[in-house]
Structure formats: C-alpha cells, structure tokens
Amino acid sequence: MAQQTFTGRKRVRKFFGHIREVAEMPNLIEVQKASYDQFLMVEEPVGGRLDEGLQAVFRSVFPISDFSNTSMLEFVRYEFEPPKYDVDECRQRGMTYAAPLKVTLRLIVFDIDEETGARSVKDIKEQDVYMGDIPLMTMNGTFVVNGTERVIVSQMHRSPGVFFDHDKGKTHSSGKLLFAARVIPYRGSWLDIEFDAKDIVFARIDRRRKLPVTSLMFALGLDGEEILSTFYKKIIYKRTKEGWRVPFDANRFRGYTTTNDVIDADTGKVVLEAGKKLTVRAARQLQEKGLKALRMTDEDIVGNYLAEDLVNPKTGEIYAEAGEEITEKSLKALNEQGYKDLTLLDIDHVNIGPYIRNTLAADKNMTREDALFDIYRVMRPGEPPTLDSAQNMFQSLFFDSERYDLSAVGRVKMNMRLELDAPDTHRTLRKEDILAVIKTLVGLRDGRGEIDDIDHLGNRRVRSVGELMENQYRIGLLRMERAIKERMSSVDIDTVMPQDLINAKPAAAAVREFFGSSQLSQFMDQTNPLSEITHKRRLSALGPGGLTRERAGFEVRDVHPTHYGRICPIETPEGPNIGLINSLATFARVNKYGFVETPYRRVKDGRVTDEVVYLSAMEEGRYAVAQANVQLDPKGRFVEDLIVCRDGGTRDVVLIPADKVDFMDVSPKQLVSVAAALIPFLENDDANRALMGSNMQRQAVPLVRAEAPFVGTGMEGVVARDSGAAIAARRTGVVDQIDATRIVIRATEDLDPTKSGVDIYRLMKFQRSNQSTCINQRPLVKVGDQVAKGDIIADGPSTDLGELALGRNVLVAFMPWNGYNFEDSILLSERIVKDDVFTSIHIEEFEVMARDTKLGPEEITRDIPNVSEEALKNLDEAGIVYIGAEVRAGDILVGKITPKGESPMTPEEKLLRAIFGEKASDVRDTSLRVPPGVQGTIVEVRVFNRHGVDKDERALAIEREEIERLAKDRDDEQAILDRNVYGRLADLLDNRQGIAGPKGFKKDTKITRAVLEEYPKSQWWMFASPNDKLMAEIEAMRKQYDESKKGLEQRFLDKVEKLQRGDELPPGVMKMVKVFVAVKRKIQPGDKMAGRHGNKGVVSKIVPIEDMPFLEDGTHADIVLNPLGVPSRMNVGQILETHLGWACAGLGKRIGQTIDAYYQKQDLKPMRETLKKIYGDDETIKSLNDAELIELARNLKPGVPIATPVFDGAKEADIEEMLHLAGLDASGQSTVYDGRTGDSFDRKVTVGYIYMLKLHHLVDDKIHARSIGPYSLVTQQPLGGKAQFGGQRFGEMEVWALEAYGAAYTLQEMLTVKSDDVAGRTKVYEAIVRGDDTFEAGIPESFNVLVKEMRSLGLNVDLHNSKLAGTPSEAAE
C-alpha cells in the first residue's frame, strides 16, 4: 500500500494484507461531531433550518400563549454569537467553552371581541433575547467544561416502537407462555397489552393496575359488536329440513377432528367418517372435488358464539346479545322463535381462539363512559371523575402531541412491525395502531408470527450528544414555559417586551446540569490518543433512561449476531459493566434514525462491485452477506460455486450458490473496534485475552521517546490523525518558519482572498492531560519543506512520524530466569532504565487560593512566620516558586499566610504584651507544599487575579511574556502577508507603462523591478498604469490587504485586552496560583507492563545488563518473559509477533550494512536492491530521490516496520520468508547464553522483538506510608486511603490471626493506642520521648460511640469503674 505522504516517505511500512480496501474508513470521531453539528446547525442559513435539533426544540415549546389567550409569544429564529474565549483560554482559565445563544422572539397581543369572541391582532413586538450559553464542541469532539475536557458518551437504548414478547413460561406454574405487547414511545406513557393465565387479554398504562383490553377499545369509541367484527370473521348457518347448512372452507377446517360423520349438504353423502382428523391435504382435496357446504346438526352448533344481537323484528326485544355462547337451552328457544339463519363467530379453538370474546364477556364495563371512568380511576386514584376530565385525560395519554411522541423512529418501527403505512410525521398513536397491536398479539397466541428479539440491533438505537442535549434543553425550556405563562398573565401585556417575560436561568441551568453531572457526561480518558478516540466512540447501555448494572441480565450483555460490523464483540470492560459498555466497530456509523449501520459491497449476478452500501441491522435481515476473505478472480467473480454466507433471516452461517449472494463485507477489520484492530495477529489470540489487550492499550502511558511498533496493523496512522494528537496540514504549502512551539506554513493552494495566506500551528508543550500524563508536540518538518494538505507536520504524545506509538520494541527472550518471572512477573534489563526506554513524564497540578476571610484577607507572600530562609530558596519576591526549580515532598510552592483569630488572653499574657509590645504575628502559615511522594521540576506557573486587585510582579512578568508571544505571531503573519502581497504587486506592475507614481517618478516611463526597489514598499500603491483592468485588480488587492492588516491588529488587541482584564474567580477568592510540576518516572519494580495480546505482568526485578541472557553476537535481552504464560492463555499472537519482530530487526541490520557500504563506496545500488527485495514493487520507494532514500534507510535501520492487518495478516509462510530474507533461522529460535556464567542454555530459546507498553498503574502512585495523620472525627480512628493520608486497616480477619497466635499485647496495642484510644496515644508519645517503653491501654473511643448508640436506642448503659480482673480501667465519661 503506497503512502505518498510527507511522513509516509520517511518510513514505509511493508503491507501484508491481501484484501483490497474498497470503502474509506469514516473519520473515527464522526459520531460525536456529526451529531452535535446536527443539533446546533450553526452553518445552516438562519431561515432555511430543518425542523430538527435546537430548531425543533424551540418549535415544540413555542408559541406560548397566556391563560386567557390574549397574547402569544412566538419563536422566530436563533443564532450564536462568537464565544468569549477560545478553547485554550478556557482550558487555562477554568471556563466553559460556550457560545451565547441569541433568540429572536415575537410577542403578539390580541384584541378579543366580547360578543363574538373573535381575536384580532392589536400589537406585534419583536426582540432578540439572550438565552444562556450553549457549550461548543472542540475540533476533537470534546467539550471544555470548567476548564476540563469532557466527553458525552452515546447511549444505547430500546428503540421506540412496539415489541412483542412472552414470559418464557416463568409466570405460571404450568409453564404456559403468556404473550405481551408493549408500545414504547420516545416520551409519554407506555402501553402494555398482555394475556393472563386464563387467556383473558388485559391492558396496562404506565405499569399501573390492569384493565380488560376491551375497556380500552370501548374508550376508543368501539361497541361490543364492532369489537367482535374487528377480530373475528362471521359464518352464516342456514336452516334446512335436514339440519344446518354451513359453507365449506378448506383453510378453516384443516386440523379439525370430527365427532360425527361429515356429510355433504348438497348430495347427502358421507365425506369423512367420525373420529378422523382432517389434514391440510385432505381438506384441499375435498375442496377440489367440489365440496361446497356441509350439513351440521344442532349439537354441532352448541358451544359456538353469536356474532350479532338477535332481535325480535316485531317487538324489538333482544333475545341474545352478540358474543353470547349458544347452549342447548338457548338453541331450543331460538328454534321455537323460528330463526332461519344464524350469524356465528368463526372460532374453532384450533386456529382461532375466543380470547377477545372471553375478555368482552368478562369486562364489566359496557359503555364508553364506564370505560373512560375506569381508566381515569386507574391513572388518578382518589380523584372523582367527570366525563369531561376523563375524556381529556384519555385524549392526552396517547393522542396529544405535547404529551406523547413516538418520534420518527418509533413510527417507522411501528409501520414495519404492524405492516401499516402512516407517514413518519404522525407521531402520536391512532386507533388503528392500537387495534393492530392487539390483533398481532392475538395472532401470536394463535401461533402465527414470531416474538421480537429485544437485543437485536434493529430494536436498539443510539442516542448521541446532539439528541441527549436536545432532550435536556427541552426540559429547560418547559420549566421556563411555566414561568413565562404566569408572567404573561400577571403583567400589563401592552407595555412589556419579550425580554421582560423571559428568564433564561432554567434553560441555562438544565444545560449546565447535563454537562456537569449527567452520567453520560464523563471526564475524558486522556491517557493517550487511543484512549481519547475510544472514549468518544463508546456506546453505553447505562445512564438516564437506560439499564442499571444490577438489573441487566446475561442476554443484554451478550454478543448478538447483529453486532457484526456494528459493535465490537471484543472491546468491553471486565467486571460489572461487561457487555453494557461497548465500542463502535471501525467502519460503523450511526444513521439519522440512530441505528448503527455497517458498509457492504454490492454483489450483482455473482460479481462483486465496488459500490458500497450502508445497511442497518433491520435491512441486513433480508440479505445474504459473504465474508471479506472470499476468493475472487481478477474480474471480481467468486472462484467457488458455493459461498459461505451469513443469512440475515435465519442469522446462521450457510452455504449459498454464488449467484444468490447479495452483499460482501468491505474489510476483514470491519467487525472489530479501533483498539482491537491495533492488535496484530488478533486472529491467533483467545477472545478473553484480546479483550484485555484492547483495554490495556488504552492505559499505556506516553513515553519520553515514542517508537512505532515494528509489527503494526496499518491502523496506527489513522488513529494518530483522527485523534488530533498528531497535527495535519490544513492546506498545501511551504514551511516558512519553525521552532519548538509553532509551525508557520505559507499556503500555495486553496488561497482565499478573504482569508490569510498563512497557517500558524501552535504546538502544545508539556501540557497536563486529564490523567496527568504529558502532552507534548514536536515538529517533523524543516523550513522550505513542501507539505500537502493532510500531511502530518508534528508528532504528539504517543505518536512517531504520524503513527500511533504506545510503547517500545524490546528484545524479548521467552525463558524462566531464577523464578523472577514466576506468575507473569517480568524481568527487565538495566539498559531499559539507563537508556530511558520506558521513562515517562507526568505533570501534577497544584493550586492555592487566597480568599477574603472574616478575619481579613489571606496573602500570598514570601514573608512566612517560623520558616527558615533555606525553605524559601525556590520562591521569588512574590512568594511563588520559580520555573525550573527542583522540588521534593514538603517543599513550599507558594507561600501563603492566613489571619488567625484573636484568642482570649490571660492576665499574665496581657502583662507581657504591655511590657514587650506587639505579639510576633497573628497569622498562620497555610502555604502550598509539595505532597508526599512527589518530586520533580516546576514547568509552569499561572497566576490569576480578581478584577480590580493589583497584580504582583510575577503576574505582570507572565503577562508580558504572553503579550510578546502574541506580538511575534502577529508580526510573522504580517511579514508573510507583506511578502505575498508586495510580491504579487511587483509581478503586476513589472514592465508596465507608468502614468503616475510616488514623488520623483518620471511620468510615462516603464516601471521595472529596479525602479520599484528605489521606493519603500508602502509607496508602491501610488504607481498607476493606463490599463484600467490592472488598476481595478490592484485596487481590490489593496483593499483586501488593508482589511487583513486591520483584522490582524484587531485580533492582537482583543487577545491583549483579555490578558490584561482581571480573571473571573469563584466568589470570595482574591487570587489563585496554579503550579505545574513535571515528574520523571523511570520504570521500576512494581510497575505494570503489558503487550498488546493481554499478556500483562508486574516488573519483579531489574537485572544488571551483564547478567541478562545474551545471544551469540553478544546482544543482551532487554526483557525475559515466562513461556508458561502462553499455552494456558492461548494468546499465541505474541509469539508470532516476536518472530516477525525478530525478522524486522534483522532486515533493519541488513539495511544498516548497505548504509555503511554507501559511505565507503558512494554507491546506492546495493541499498536500492535490498529495499526492492524487502518491499517488492512498491511505488513509494521507486519514486524516492537519493537524499530521500538515504533518510528512509536511516529510519529503517532499527527495524523494518510492517503492517499485518487483523484477519488478513502475515501467514506462517510469510514469517518464514521474512526470517529467511533477514538471514535468520526459520524456527525463530536462537542459542542463548547465561549472562552470569557465560554457558549456553541446553535448549534453543525463542528470541525476538515484542512491543511492550508501560501501563498507567505505577507503583509510585500506589505506594504510601503514614506515621501520624488525620483521624476520623466520630470514631477517632485513622482515615483510610492514600488520598486522605490514611493508615492501614486492621480488619476482623487480621484480629483473628493475632488471636490465633495468642499475641495478646500486640493485639491490644493495635486496637487501642495505635488506633482510637485518644488519651493512650498521647501517653505513648510522651513515654517514647522520655525513653520509657511501657504504656497502658485505655478505653477505645469507638467503645464510647457504641455506648452512645445504645443510649440512643433507649438502653441506659453505664461503665462502672471497678477493678476488673486486676486491671485498672478508666471511666467512660
């Protein structure tokens, strides 16, 4: 795969994939960006916005009318003003990156005619109203809230619509399946319709008490006869001399067992004897023979049900009602009345059951009014119903668009499931919908149709940022609506403006609450670029409106066939959240309805085309899909006749003829997530280990020197670019200026006359991430380099030449070593520590605030009482630590003093004060000190002052530096602008006839470059030429130049003004100082490391280089792993990676030899030939010139990087071939010598290069020791945990252990003086000071707590101070 990019030419990856990628992988953070853009619609023209997102929210809440309908507030449009601070300023100041929302509202006041009640418009007022700030998304798909980056995780929830299910036979002891249907709206009441054990159908609203479903139908306006005719067909039985004549229908009589002989009504012949079962085939044959009607006797009619009321036509008397069962008695009465024909319900108890008829019979409500009252009583128990209120309440439950919303998705799903065709704009329920649901449910009970699978991805959808935010903002607006209505009614509506009616606080508060405290708004995992990207692609089933951990069963957490290509089956957390938190697959995207789609190539008549189609899980159910690795001939036809496919309908893997295949996967890696796609040889790892591997890559700490893996998968570049860690060029151009903090590129394409022709890229230097890892970007380009749009120009944390680089390639030997790698321990060589291979920088942030207290303001100063000059050596005159100072635990970072309260003085003190004057100080030292366990260098200090507080020297110095930086940016941009503009102007004026010019220019002479050089550039604009077109062009250029210049100056002044303005600090805070300490962490025993295959371990020992096992050429292994960690874990991928890494390093050595040869003989031919052998016919390598070739060879010297994509990577033969090319043993094993004795080991050992990561579980963050520290207030026991500087818990089991050993005194000491015997603690201290080693244990404070607890229960407990068993004991009080 040729990568013709700037960095791609510097280091070429050999690609092992065989399958051509047809579809472009979508941008990896598209989910977040697209969703939020759709919500805000900033880019859309204000008038032409679609009814979705923010627009839809306003449209749904407005217009708002007052209670008397005399005025109305209408929504016109909204727009955003530019944000007050940009992203970086928000991060530094602890602000939220947000834009003010301006909404135009129109207030219409009506005149109401008292007689007719007609309204006429009296007055219209329009006004812009500020509606709070809406947080904006940064370029990388995050939000900056109160200065920290947060991510809004997408939520998976049950799609709105209708679902059919049964209880799996659990409810009733007989194991009978009870079917149920549930209509779930997007918002509004749930409607459940369910069977009970007696086959009566009930309805429940919002899980309240159940009602017979016929009551619901009565409330919908049907009567008994209509209900029966909706659910059952009618059959007319005609009276003849011989009996009853019934029309014969094969479908109806199939499966029917006869009790009497079946007789043809026309011929009188017996067609079927008694006791026989009528099969489907036999029934069809009878119909074909011309059987039209059967003869039935009276006893055949008994037990059937009437379809219509039987009325005496003369008197109007009702003999029997519709739905009544015919008994022998009632049949006799009917015969006496002389009815010639009866209309009965077609219920045969086999194919059609009498459930609705039985429900109707059991229902005590017979009219619409009764039914409405009943529903009202269920929904609002205790309130007396009136017909009006009951009607309104029922109407508002399902049919009012303000209260009930199915959403477009819900309507689409409902139409599909019930085979209806309502438009997706109709978002409330209809009568037809409810009847269709009941019909389908009864059909299920009769054995027709299938229940739904709620874990099918067609029944679960994704709510992304935009939608979550939309719901939240709607809640805020609805809260506001109530207030507006009340205000409209209470003020004089003729004199007010819209501004006076609106209080935007509730809307702003809803947004703030959502970003600050919602379960889905999470502190971004910023350990490395991969963890950022994964966090943004996460799908959570938890959160508001979702599941809870405790309630979620196995089914929800399981992998489902529809996850293929949509949700990764591998990446999910271990522990209680397993399966509830998932990750999007690499190629997946979310469609407009919120369903996850995956791309497929269309197959036409057995030929695979390059047309890519995205299918959701519902659509895929209709097709057969072939795998990406099916063999194709050069024309794209299938080689095999039978193809292995996934059949969407049965969800099974089947063999299908080639011409029946509909689609084919676009790529083998489309079924896994980004993190899993970064694991080479994933196909050779057990799934459990792959899960750990993909999770642990997210915990890899960025190292000081990033190094891309020798054995990659080809995804590394994609992740680095899309995560925003590496910087890509926005436009094609030439590098103009460069230093460590910024890159200036002069654009040569995409030039827009209204915009600057210069792109300035600011690099982040030693910034702290959310996880305290270090974010540092380094430029990759030199001045004069040509870069194309999209080329990587700077590396970020954990990236190397634009590729993700989470760890380092180290030389590994798989062998036991003195038990030091027992149980997954890891043995390391001292070289790793010495060469800083696994060294990382962590930046800790400490802040201190000077507040205004009741006793006076706190002060940040160098003048601290009772502190030696030695302790202040790192502070400047303002009392703040210098940048670059080395600090360790306990050092002062910022000196601060707090006024102390005056304590009442004793007469003696008063006398002394009178004699000796003022007391030394009434302030105490509250300085910010370095906490225990931290040691490092100060890299940055930020000082924030409240507006109106004088800035100290340090704050002014920081401000001056910042202004200089801004001025330099402005001057550089100005210089490039001048160069561009005057260069173009000189080109335009060159060799033109001059008719005017600056002072001293002779008229009608030629303007040449030499003439121009004589005048300052600012006077060039005075030259004039007779060519009008030329002059117009120059005039336009000048206008644009002046505008650009003015814009630059204005931007600079704005930024300076922001700097000099005071900061917005929390109330009561006068000044705040933030100090950043960079801590260098070398790897040490106790740190956790891991490979990419779930092979994790803890460093047990660091061994001197000379003691490590070494190879024949004297190279020492860097790391020794236990071979027993492989077989039982079944992650063989690490072994294949080791072999391939060994080959890569071997090839790198060979390239190194060709470099040496070039320096000796100046001949590049051997180098080109070696590279051709390795890479084959790679276009990139052919196109390189000599200088580029040498640079490439230098970069390949440590090892040749290769890409082996998941499920389509290097096979065993490829690995052997690579080893052969490198001149190494094809077994991948080498003779290894013991570093301590120099003897060779008996067996050959697998040696190679493996990519190891250092994980963010560092022993320095965990180790902790306490002597005396804080105690809990109530129990007086030490606190626990490192954060509280707590002690170690001596728990119940530890007490048992000491009891078992009979260590009575040790135990007593643990439970008293070392814990919560307050008096005893001080006595022990005094005894130790005296040099005495005896002590006496008193009563633990927790005993007193117990006594108090018992007293609170009303039990008076006293401790008597008697001599107990000869030991003195003090009274409790």
UniProtKB/Swiss-Prot annotation:
Purpose: DNA-dependent RNA polymerase catalyzes the transcription of DNA into RNA using the four ribonucleoside triphosphates as substrates.
Transmembrane segments: none
GO biological process, one term: DNA-templated transcription
GO MF, one example: DNA-directed RNA polymerase activity
EC number: 2.7.7.6
InterPro entries: DNA-dir_RNA_pol_bsu_ext_1_sf (IPR042107), DNA-dir_RNA_pol_bsu_external_1 (IPR019462), DNA-dir_RNA_pol_su2 (IPR015712), DNA-dir_RNAP_su2_dom (IPR007120), DNA-dir_RNAP_su2_hyb_sf (IPR037033), RNA_pol_bsu_bac (IPR010243), RNA_pol_bsu_CS (IPR007121), RNA_pol_bsu_protrusion (IPR007644)
Keywords: DNA-directed RNA polymerase, Nucleotidyltransferase, Transcription, Transferase
Protein name according to UniProt: DNA-directed RNA polymerase subunit beta
Entry's Gene Ontology cellular component terms: DNA-directed RNA polymerase complex
Highest taxon above the source species: Bacteria
Reactions accelerated catalytically: RNA(n) + a ribonucleoside 5'-triphosphate = RNA(n+1) + diphosphate
Record-stated family: Belongs to the RNA polymerase beta chain family.
